[in-house]
């Protein structure tokens, strides 16, 4: 599994399982709202009054309506900031 998928899939799956309403902002600024019905490598199926298939490459941000508890893979990616004095 690609490193990017190790966080994305558990996050989207938690949103789908718990049926948490989301706002999805597209790269062109459009805001879509609904619940994630399904997703795969390339698209998210968003459920509202109608179902919309949204291509992931068009998505800028996914904002849940409430906090999400999910178990993403925790990897040491060496992006921690140095402690004070260790610059």
Curated annotation (Swiss-Prot):
GO CC term (a single one): cytosol
Coiled coil: none
InterPro entries, A to Z: Hfq (IPR005001), LSM_dom_sf (IPR010920), Sm (IPR047575)
Cysteine-cysteine disulfides: none
Protein's UniProt name: RNA-binding protein Hfq
Keyword RNA-binding: yes
Family the UniProt entry places it in: Belongs to the Hfq family.
GO MF: RNA binding
């Amino acid at each position: 599994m690609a490193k990017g998928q190790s966080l994305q899939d558990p996050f989207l799956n938690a949103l789908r399982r718990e049926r948490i309403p989301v706002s999805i902002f597209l790269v062109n600024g459009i805001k879509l709202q609904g619940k994630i019905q399904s997703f795969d490598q390339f698209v998210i199926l968003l459920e509202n009054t109608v179902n919309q298939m949204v291509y992931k490459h068009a998505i800028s941000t996914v904002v849940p309506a409430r906090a999400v508890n999910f178990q993403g893979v925790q990897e040491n990616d060496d992006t921690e900031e140095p402690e004070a004095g260790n610059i």
